[in-house]
Amino acid sequence: MDALLKEIEKLSQPSLQKENNDVCDLCFMQMKKISNYQLLCEECGQLKDWFEPEYNEKFTVYSRLKIVGANSSYHQRDLDKANSSDYSSLQFHHILEELKSLNVKYMDAGQKPFPIQVLKETAHSYNQVQQHRVIRSITKLQILASILRSICLKLNIACTVADAARFTQLNTKGISKGMDLLRSLFVDNKITLNVDLNPIDSFINSTYSALQIKQIHQELQEENVYNLKEIVKSFILYADEKNIGVDLNRRTVVIATMYNVLRRAYYPIEIDTVVYQCKIRKNTITRALKMYEDYYSHFKSLYEQYHLNAAKKLI
């Protein structure tokens, strides 16, 4: 009798989809769970979407229907889209948990973790993309990396393409495929995230913070801080307009420009300090600084406009 009661109690609990109920549509072999969202057939290599709901007390009933049999994965996505909004909410929470896990690994690798606001907005934007595209494997990681970087730029948080790729543990530093897909969805008004934001402001803010200028010189007024950032930005925009240094990394150009402006404003800063504080190689920033030497005649008028030291070479 006790055994029977236990079985009845098990049946009364919210049912969860089990991994061993899934077989490959092509070769009918058992599929292996490789993530919270995908199954892999080790026999033929087919990938299949996987969904493992979490019980949440605020949902009285799980309303997701599971299609079984041949071509089930092909039809499951359309059925999910037609299902209740609870499923979309569960998708959001699954992605957010995955991003949190990646954030911990990113921090364990010695990198500065991203704020929770960035992770939440990334999960929200990815959820929008899921309504219009079936996303798999590497494409999913590239899209997550592209969204993460765009969210950071929107919030003026520095994030390079390499940072985003490292966060999602991509084997390469390229995320162009993800960027192209997001760009096409934005143009078609299917998502609200613009991936073509200029990263200059976020890099200027992060470089300024890394150099700890305000902490070291507390007499600086906010007006002076604002002016410094605007002067640095004007130099970079002018260089872009003249096609100067466009092949250089944006972050490198920002760091080199801020160092150049500070030196010409008679601010006591050494290049070794910049290298250490901004975690950049000396030869990298030196290469970017050479841009201001090679095109001195172009920048001379800006030096004079902002009352900076206009000498061709600084001692």
Curated annotation (Swiss-Prot):
Superkingdom of origin: Viruses
Family, per entry: Belongs to the asfivirus C315R family.
Primary role: Putative initation factor.
Name under which the protein is recorded: Initiation factor TFIIB homolog
